[in-house]
Amino acid sequence: MNKTKGFTKYKKMRYMPGLDGLRAIAVLGIIIYHLNKQWLTGGFLGVDTFFVISGYLITSLLLKEYDDTGIIKLKSFWIRRLKRLLPAVIVLLMVVGTATLLLKSDNIIRVKHDIIAAIFYVSNWWYIAKDVNYFEQFSFMPLKHLWSLAIEEQFYIFFPVILVTLLLTIKKRYKIGFIFWGVSIISLGLMMFIYSINGDHSRVYFGTDTRLQTLLLGVILAFLWPPFKLKNDPPKVVKYVIDSIGSLSFIVLILLFFIINDETNWIYDGGFYLISILTLFIIASVVHPSTWIAKIFSNPVLVFIGKRSYSLYLWHFAVISFVHSYYVDGQIPVYVYFIDISLTIIFAELSYRFIETPFRKEGIKALNWRSSYIPQFIRMVIVVTLLIPFMLILVGAFNKYGKDIIGEKANSFDTTIEDNYSMRIAPIDNIHIDGLVSEKKKESSDVYNNIKPLLIGDSVMVDIGESFKSSVPKSRIDGKVGRQLYQTLPLVKANYSQYKKSSDQVVLELGTNGDFTVKQLDDLLNQFGKAKIYLVNTRVPRIYEANVNRLLADAAKRKSNVTLIDWYKRSQGHSEYFAPDGVHLEYKGVLALKDEILKALKKK
């Protein structure tokens, strides 16, 4: 290269509206998924689309700067990234923190911790440490979506340094591309290995090391298909091939958005990698200056949405988290979704116009009191109403209003020695006083000493454990949060093998946390021999609900000693039975489910 390092002028890379169009598709998929998982079960794949785009675009920018000037100014790159990303995030954190304090003060400690993690762009590792499940929506976590921004920011910090080092030490770029491809394979292998050991979704889904594969595929494409070297008018056959491959890949990707769900395990065994390769083909076609698919993705509507994709991504999940927290999940009225969408659009547009654009163009100068972007009065209101409480939240001034919500909830309910139960203290939140009469006392009026059932279940069983034990003192109850049916077989073999006689009664409440197979269900049922088995079906706003209930109903039809307890039917239309997550039970729900189980047990 005949150039003087550091002095040749850097020519800005051409704008590629097709990428904005692809961003629009990705963010719309994510928003629809978070509004209601069952509308677009694989919408979360939009995050991977963003990862591939980021890897491709950032690498292309850095390579072009290196080709034009002979150097890459790392400091300038990092400043541009901060100007682009940080201001909007800080405003989001201030708004969410203040809103949590005003509307959801019980959650202020948890949200404060999430805010601190987000400020330092380590949200993904924070959620791994706290064993948070991305696909589980039982908890109020309005900042959980920032895990992906944390991964991208970590990538922006370390990748340019590695790229510069490789460019200076390795002259053949195809060798550099092979190095990144090798690292992507290592990342893929790490995801497969960790997942195979313990099936831990959280670790492999949130981990920078396991998600690096997707970003690096974008990096590799930048080496193979740099946008600044593409010909404006290639042969027609070349354009036809590019359009055909890109179109077919896009169709397959959209189909996967509808087919894949959060219970699809093969995505952790190479699925994310293959899906990202599809995205590579789409990117290659939409960034080409002469393809018709690029023109389709460059239409004004998609470009408009794509330019605001960052703001839409930032705000949609926070809005949905707050709004949906006032409704029972799975029983949300249609008009609520219009509220979600309207508020998301409003906040995103305000952020784009008054935060993103000014700071991207002017940097810190956007805070100048004489700036035309934000009038002085509005600026003062923002500082007073958001910044001050935000700082107080960070220093823990409002911790007294928060609660250790996770610590307050029982993780298990296990009664194995009947005599010990008389010493157990009923939880205060199970006692409701209306006037001077305790509902707990009313509930305990009927006691059944003539039955000795075994009850095994998940968190719903934990919910009813105290109440059921008070009514059936000789019952044996084993409930654990997060328990799945396939995990129960070893438990039964180890602890409950004696429940095999025709006089025994066994209640199984499983299926809240995931699907299972016919074989897994039959293996469990066969452990109880001739015992009378009662299967409680589930009400859970998840994609697997229908299949779980179908398998349980089929088992009751196939086996003469199995009876179905239809909790799904009993709870239909009774939102008062449920906590906001639509699964766990409020007091009335506890009584209703206990009643259903007792009715079935008393019949035999």
Swiss-Prot record:
The active site is at residues 459, 581, 584. It is found in: Cell membrane. Its EC number is 2.3.1.-. Its main location: membrane. It holds the Pfam family Acyl_transf_3. GO terms for cellular component: plasma membrane. One of its GO terms (biological process) is lipopolysaccharide biosynthetic process. The chain crosses the membrane at residues 15-35, 43-63, 85-105, 150-170, 176-196, 212-232, 240-260, 267-287, 310-330, 332-352, 377-397. Belongs to the acyltransferase 3 family. This is Putative O-acetyltransferase SAR0937.
